């Protein structure tokens, strides 16, 4: 599940 972007530090997996 994408919970944001990696750059924001939320660990977004897309």
Curated annotation (Swiss-Prot):
Its main location: secreted. Heterohexamer; disulfide linked. Contains 2 sets of 3 non-identical chains (alpha, beta and gamma). The 2 heterotrimers are in head to head conformation with the N-termini in a small central domain. This is Fibrinogen alpha chain. Keywords: Blood coagulation, Coiled coil, Disulfide bond, Hemostasis, Secreted. Conversion of fibrinogen to fibrin is triggered by thrombin, which cleaves fibrinopeptides A and B from alpha and beta chains, and thus exposes the N-terminal polymerization sites responsible for the formation of the soft clot. The soft clot is converted into the hard clot by factor XIIIA which catalyzes the epsilon-(gamma-glutamyl)lysine cross-linking between gamma chains (stronger) and between alpha chains (weaker) of different monomers. Forms F13A-mediated cross-links between a glutamine and the epsilon-amino group of a lysine residue, forming fibronectin-fibrinogen heteropolymers. Cleaved by the protease thrombin to yield monomers which, together with fibrinogen beta (FGB) and fibrinogen gamma (FGG), polymerize to form an insoluble fibrin matrix. Fibrin has a major function in hemostasis as one of the primary components of blood clots. The keyword Secreted applies. It is found in: Secreted. One of its GO terms (biological process) is blood coagulation. A long coiled coil structure formed by 3 polypeptide chains connects the central nodule to the C-terminal domains (distal nodules). The long C-terminal ends of the alpha chains fold back, contributing a fourth strand to the coiled coil structure. GO terms for cellular component: extracellular region. It comes from Tiliqua rugosa (Shingleback lizard). The gene is FGA.
């Amino acid at each position: 599940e994408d919970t944001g972007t990696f750059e924001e530090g939320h660990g977004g997996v897309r």
